[in-house]
């Protein structure tokens, strides 16, 4: 971070505030949230939060805050959850639905579209926004609030995620595969999707496979696009 700032002519000691990507703070509102020791303690407890690169942002920002005595915050954390009550209900009472994932990107794109394309305030618009990365999620924003979503582990597969599968098949796999919970989680969250089918998460490489005549790669790639389109619909 220091090298990046200095290479762009910005001295670290000239910062007046620092804002980072937010970690997996469960059920927080959108927007800016101040970073303090309690937040850092929560984000570093393995039983409370999943390991994710976004955790590093708050820790780096907190270090800069302490060193220079400046305000530090996270923004649109991946744990942002504003889902309406009716969307939280699942068919298994012990497992309610919730929002987690790509708030920072999807909300920014919705705000940008409202401002630059529709010329309307974001809080007067309704958007369906698709984030398509290593994991993919779909967000429904209504009047500035993310009222529903398709999380990256409950919709279609993506470059790294296994996506939704039949519950009977999943339960059977968990109890007959001989794998522990950590291994099964990795199969669905990190080693699934394109990675599992084609041994790569790079869509450019997949397109090269298709151009070279790999029919299986073509079917898998089209299946991913088809599934994401269904999630949007």
Predicted regions and their residues:
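Phosphate/pyrophosphate-binding loops at sites that engage ATP/ADP/AMP, CoA/4′-phosphopantetheine
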Residues: 3-16, 116-121, 231-233
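Short beta-strand-loop/turn "lid" adjacent to the catalytic site in phosphate-handling enzymes
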Residues: 5-53, 79-90
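General beta-strand structural signal in soluble alpha/beta enzymes
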Residues: 17-20, 71-77, 128-130, 140, ...
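Gly-rich Lys/Arg/Thr-decorated short loops/hinges at beta-loop-alpha junctions or inter-strand turns
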Residues: 41-43, 88-93, 208-216
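Glycine-rich phosphate-binding loop plus the immediately following alpha-helix
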Residues: 55-63, 74, 89, 94-126, ...
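Short acidic/polar capping segments at secondary-structure boundaries
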Residues: 77-82, 133-136
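Adenine-nucleotide phosphate-binding core of ATP-dependent small-molecule kinases
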Residues: 186-233
């Amino acid at each position: 971070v220091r090298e990046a700032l200095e290479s762009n002519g910005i001295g670290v000691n000239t910062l007046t505030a620092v804002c980072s990507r937010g970690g997996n703070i469960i059920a927080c509102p959108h927007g800016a949230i101040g970073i303090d020791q309690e937040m850092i303690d929560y984000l570093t407890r393995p039983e409370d939060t999943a390991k994710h690169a976004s955790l590093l942002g708050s820790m780096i920002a907190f270090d800069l805050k302490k060193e220079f005595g400046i305000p530090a915050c996270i923004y649109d954390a991946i744990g942002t959850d504003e889902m309406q009550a009716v969307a939280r209900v699942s068919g298994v009472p012990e497992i309610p639905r919730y929002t987690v994932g790509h708030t920072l990107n999807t909300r920014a794109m919705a705000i940008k579209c409202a401002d630059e394309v529709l010329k309307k305030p974001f809080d007067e618009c309704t958007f369906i926004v698709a984030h398509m990365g290593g994991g993919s999620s779909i967000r429904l924003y209504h009047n500035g609030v993310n009222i529903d979503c398709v999380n990256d582990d409950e919709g279609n597969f993506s470059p790294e995620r296994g996506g939704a599968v039949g519950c009977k098949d999943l339960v059977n796999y968990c109890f007959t595969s001989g794998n522990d919970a950590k291994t099964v989680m990795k199969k669905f969250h990190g080693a699934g999707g394109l990675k599992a089918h084609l041994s790569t998460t790079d869509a450019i490489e997949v397109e090269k496979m298709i151009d070279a005549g790999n029919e299986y790669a073509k079917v898998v790639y089209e299946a991913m696009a088809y599934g994401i389109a269904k999630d949007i619909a």
